[in-house]
């Protein structure tokens, strides 16, 4: 019962922790926690005032940019360039603003999707529906930076990273982050993010399609943010409209030792190149 949790009586033998429960014809869930890794309780010192905001009152947009405060000036440069060049209506939000309004102040990747779904549900069938989402910041497989992989990453860089959505599997071969999650905006379509079914050794299929285009700038520092915006603005202002823009390079991962370097990604990439070749003259 999720509303009535109980502490199990356990027995520790070396590194093995065991407990006994009576047999039952129902699903029961057990959670193991490390007390030193739990979220600290709120104290008067940690509490702070939340500035009034009203993201729900925002007019419809073509594009949303989610940017840490440290990168906001660079996001504004990009916003201005797209508004002047492409006539887009763009709004920039910090992740904290989104959490405060869409996840009760708690950092939660689903809050990004809820923001976009709000815009989508208002005008899903006309020209005012949202078209693009840009995540202006790198992501991590460990959203809370608890693993040793992040011990050498500075606090400033951590603060400049945006959350990722990840599949429920925790196995190295079948777990992956997916920004696509933020773009499945029809009701219940978020389930299109495939979770590996270990019982059937397969991924389930889905007919859901993305409703917006999604991009991410994997930047962690102000210098990197400036460089990527400079590059994009330079690309937008390039008057050389030659065939070079149709030259594509596909790069595929070769897998890892965990899957014996299965070339599945290379096969998928080759299939994409074939599709492009066959449809290159399509409008």
Region annotations inferred by a language model:
Residues 1-283:
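Cysteine-dependent hydrolase recognition
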């Amino acid at each position: 019962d999720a509303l009535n949790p109980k502490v199990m009586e356990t027995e520790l033998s070396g590194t093995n922790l065991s407990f006994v429960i009576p047999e039952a014809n129902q699903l029961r869930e057990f959670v193991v926690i490390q007390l030193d890794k739990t979220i600290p309780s709120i104290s008067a010192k940690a509490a702070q005032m939340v500035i009034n905001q009203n993201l729900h009152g925002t007019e419809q947009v073509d594009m949303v940019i989610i940017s840490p405060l440290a990168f906001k000036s660079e996001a504004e440069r990009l916003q201005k360039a797209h508004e002047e060049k492409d006539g887009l209506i763009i709004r920039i939000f910090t992740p904290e603003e989104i959490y405060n309004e869409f996840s009760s102040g708690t950092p939660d990747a689903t809050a990004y999707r809820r923001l976009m779904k709000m815009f989508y549900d208002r005008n899903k069938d006309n020209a005012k529906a949202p078209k693009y989402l840009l995540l202006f910041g790198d992501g991590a497989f460990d959203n809370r930076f608890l693993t040793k992989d992040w011990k050498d990453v500075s606090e400033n860089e951590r603060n400049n990273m945006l959350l990722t959505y990840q599949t429920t599997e925790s196995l190295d071969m079948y777990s992956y982050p997916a920004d696509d999650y933020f773009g499945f905006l029809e009701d219940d379509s978020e389930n299109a993010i495939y979770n590996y079914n270990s019982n059937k050794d397969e991924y389930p299929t889905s007919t859901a399609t993305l409703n917006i285009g999604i991009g991410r700038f994997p930047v962690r520092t102000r210098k990197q943010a400036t460089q990527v915006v400079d590059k994009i603005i330079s690309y937008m202002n390039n008057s050389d409209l030659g065939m070079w823009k149709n030259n594509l390079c596909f790069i595929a991962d070769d897998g890892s030792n965990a899957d014996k370097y299965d070339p599945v990604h290379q096969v998928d990439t080759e299939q994409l190149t074939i599709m492009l070749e066959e449809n290159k003259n399509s409008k």
